[in-house]
UniProtKB/Swiss-Prot annotation:
Pfam families: PARM. It is a single-pass type I membrane protein. Residues 40-74, 92-103 have a biased composition (Polar residues). Residues 1-20 form the signal peptide. Highly N-glycosylated and O-glycosylated. This is Prostate androgen-regulated mucin-like protein 1 homolog. Residues 280-310 are cytoplasmic. Keywords: Cell membrane, Endosome, Glycoprotein, Golgi apparatus, Membrane, Phosphoprotein, Signal, Transmembrane, Transmembrane helix. It comes from Pongo abelii (Sumatran orangutan). It is found in: Cell membrane; Golgi apparatus membrane; Endosome membrane.
Length: 310
């Protein structure tokens, strides 16, 4: 029982490790996930194990059901789950990468005999919170069980944070004497296009099937407000510069001599006007009315020198 439990935990850990293997052409698939700790139930048959199935749902199971609780980190922040493979080839979903016994296996998982088919699936929850459902199908011979090596780094360690929308992607791992990643198909939100730069010793040519969709960007149409603002600014600048130019021109045009000449001219004009008015008044003035005494009273008109009283 203990052996089966450890075996199941090792397979689960190896599945998580395969997702975080480094590749020559790094393909980072961003998933903002809030992963709740799922309850994983392993269903196995005695001796010749045809299929070990792990699913987060509560299904029917026989007497050899081992409830294993896989503790997953609960996080409120989006996590970036990157799928990487070191010195391995990314091919189409239908092709298999075949290596020899001398080829190094990826760290964290090695098998001695039999073909191991490991399928890791991440599905998006209907509420927007993706849940990790791991379905591992293992076929092996009962004589030589595969030797599993614990991963060097914890598989639950999140990499860099990302803000890209959630997506559904599946990673199918088929191992024949050595574990390799054969297909990576991200679907949903667009990811960075893959560009594998290094090739392994195999004869296959790496092909990439990742579809990159352009992200729609909102472009604001040009408005006429900017033109109005520019016109207003130009008007303000012109209105503020014109008086300054005029004042500068006046300051350069009017010197002290010109100011004195203007002042003297104004004073002369004023004196001339008052002089002409005084001359005309003096010339047309009279010494009084040339009337009789009875018109002015008994005292007579003594103010008029032409008046003759006798």
């Amino acid at each position: 029982m203990v052996y089966k439990t450890l075996f199941a935990l090792c397979i689960l850990t190896a599945g998580w490790r395969v997702q975080s293997l480094p590749t020559s052409a790094p393909l980072s698939v961003s998933l903002p996930t809030n992963i709740m700790p799922p309850t994983t139930i392993w269903t196995s048959s005695p001796q010749n194990t045809d299929a070990d199935t792990a699913s987060p749902s509560n299904g029917t199971h026989n007497n050899s059901v081992l409830p294993v609780t896989a503790s997953a980190p609960t996080s409120l922040l989006p996590k970036n789950i990157s799928v990487e493979s070191r010195e391995e080839e990314i091919t189409s979903p239908g092709s298999n990468w075949e290596g020899t016994n001398t080829d190094p296996s990826p760290p964290g998982f090695s098998s001695t005999s039999g073909g191991v088919h490991l399928t890791t699936t991440l599905e998006e929850h209907s509420l927007g919170t993706p849940e990790a459902g791991v379905a591992a199908t293992l076929s092996q011979s009962a004589a030589e069980p595969p030797t599993l090596i614990s991963p060097q780094a914890p598989a639950s360690s999140p990499s860099s944070l990302s803000t890209s929308p959630p997506e559904v992607f599946s990673v199918s791992v088929t191992t024949n004497h050595s574990s390799t990643v054969t297909s990576t198909q991200p679907t949903g939100a667009p990811t960075a296009p893959e560009s594998p730069t290094e090739e392994s010793s195999s004869d296959h040519t790496p092909t990439s099937h990742a579809t990159a969709e352009p992200v729609p960007q909102e472009k604001t149409p040009p408005t006429t407000v900017s033109g109005k603002v520019m016109c207003e600014l130009i008007d303000m600048e012109t209105t503020t510069t014109f008086p300054r130019v005029i004042m500068q021109e006046v300051e350069h045009a009017l010197s002290s001599g010109s100011i004195a000449a203007i002042t003297v001219t104004v004073i002369a004009v004023v004196l001339l006007v008052f002089g002409v008015a005084a001359y005309l008044k003096i010339r047309h003035s009279s010494y009084g009315r040339l009337l009789d005494d009875h018109d002015y009273g008994s005292w007579g008109n003594y103010n008029n020198p032409l008046y003759d009283d006798s």
